[in-house]
Design a protein with these regions (language model features):
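His/acidic metal-ligating clusters that form di-metal
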Residues: 1-68
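Binuclear metal-dependent phosphoesterase catalytic core
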Residues: 60-124
């Protein structure tokens, strides 16, 4: 990461994708990255940094200084919230409820005469 950002201007928006969160979300369950402090130190000089991760199967957002973190929900199976139980074991849901708990969405569009625009929305 240090080499990747070394030549960039500090006003360059940075987006980092990682599987495990770059902050200590819940270390007892392995929901954090051991070298996160070092990785984030390379990004301190940038005005806008967004870190996106999975692993925790939870929608979660927080901001620390110039860095905004977003954890995405699951596309496989739901996990309990941090600390609910001794370990992050898959939750059992009633029949027919699994699809509602997953981060699977269908997106459709109709071809028109204008370029398709993407609209950013805040994660809830």
């Amino acid at each position: 990461m240090e080499k990747d950002v070394a030549s960039l201007s500090s006003d360059t928006p940075i987006v980092v994708f990682s599987h495990i969160p770059l902050f200590a979300m819940y270390p007892d369950w392995g929901w954090g990255t051991d070298d996160a402090t070092q990785a984030l130190s390379y990004l301190k000089r940038f005005a806008s940094v967004t870190c996106l991760n999975g692993h925790v199967h939870q929608v979660f957002s927080k901001t620390e200084g110039n860095v905004t973190f977003h954890s995405g929900t699951t596309t496989a199976y739901p996990l309990p919230h941090p600390g609910d139980g001794p370990a992050p074991k898959p939750l059992t849901l009633p029949a027919g409820k699994l699809h509602d708990a997953l981060g699977i969405r269908e997106v459709s569009y109709q071809t028109g005469q204008h370029t398709l625009a993407l609209k950013e929305r805040t994660l809830l």
